[in-house]
Amino acid sequence: RFQRLTGGYRTFCRLTLAQARGVPGPRLLELGAGLGRLALYLTDRHPTARVTVSDIDPDVVERIRRGPVGSHPRVTPAVLDATSIDAPDDAFDVAVLTMTLHHLPTPGVVALLEEGTRVARRLLIIDGWRHPAYLAVAPLLWTTGGLPHLHDGLISLRRLYGAKALHALAGACAPTVAVRTRFAPPGY
């Protein structure tokens, strides 16, 4: 609910499709997709995009398969580990991970960067903005999900990777991964 209320999915979709600009029939990989709502935004806004929507949890992927995302003709649900992706090199034009990076430990981030850039021409990571002003969203977290959502949100805010950390982790990749960071309203 939080991403729908704040326009997050629209922002994620816009940023993802910008990475696929000029590619006819782009092959998109959504990593750590949860319920895969971004896949519906992507297929609604790009008439030829094909999306593999994935999560590490088989139960989550089964829920995707049984729902509106899984029944879409241009969406393929898959159980995938974002740190060890079972796909050939350059299988996708864009791989995208949204609001999940902060859940990975440091070695997992390095593995994600290596794997994401191996299987896709571009890897787009969208996560929260590490800044004290981000605490202003606490009331919205409470409103959209109650105490559990507020608790998870505040912990997530503390675990966000900053730009310096991402550049350092990209330098630890083999081969080194080029990283560009920027702020994208409403707070990513």
Predicted regions and their residues:
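C-terminal alpha-helical "lid/dimerization" subdomain adjacent to the S-adenosyl-L-methionine
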Residues: G128-A174, V179-T181
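Class I SAM-dependent methyltransferase SAM/SAH-binding core
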Residues: L29, L35-S84
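A short, conserved alpha-helix within the catalytic core of class I
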Residues: L104-E115
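Class I SAM-dependent methyltransferase Rossmann-like catalytic core
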Residues: R1-T11
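Conserved beta-strand signature within the Rossmann-like core of class I S-adenosyl-L-methionine
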Residues: A120-G128
